[in-house]
Amino acid sequence: YLDHTNFHKYVTDLIGIRVFFLYREDWIHFHRYIVSQFENNPEQYVVDRLNDFDENPNHYYIAELPKAYKRPGDSKIYDGSEIAIITDGIYRSLHYIVKYKGYYVEIQGRTLFEEGWSEVDHDIVYKETMDDEMLRDYSGLLNRLSGLADEMSSYFRRLKQEKENIDMHHMK
């Protein structure tokens, strides 16, 4: 059971870091950085918080399989990666639980659109009002629109890069 002597073995978000990126496809740079800084051995993923806890404060490792929370219908950008895809709910974010200096640390990565939407959703349609069918429907609609805006920013980025490539090719 949880008490003041072992809380650090149970609580995975006592320390949290949120990283923002402009374009969703930049997630791979974030992922590669995390994996390069922390040992990533699936055999060390924590199943039993109390018994699987590594007491060595100098052992820095990824403690759980990284997760990508996304909505059904979102881009398949995470498919085929070494990340668990979770599609329940309206939440969008990447989650890593790492062990650092004797504590679990939650590291999240998301786009600015995802962060902006989560703040609006949290302010207007948080858990207390999710019983309201109309608010729930509008929340779902706005979440889908936010996801489309996120996708459009990536599309425009690729379009700009293609145009620059074509312009460079014609200049030769």
Question: Model-predicted segments: where are they?
Answer:
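Long beta-strand-rich cores associated with HINT superfamily self-processing modules
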Residues: 8, 16, 20-158
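Phosphate/adenylate-binding "loop-and-lid" substructures adjacent to NTP/NAD/dNTP-binding pockets
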Residues: 1-15
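Intrinsically disordered, low-complexity acidic/polar and Pro/Ser/Thr-rich regulatory regions
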Residues: 159-172
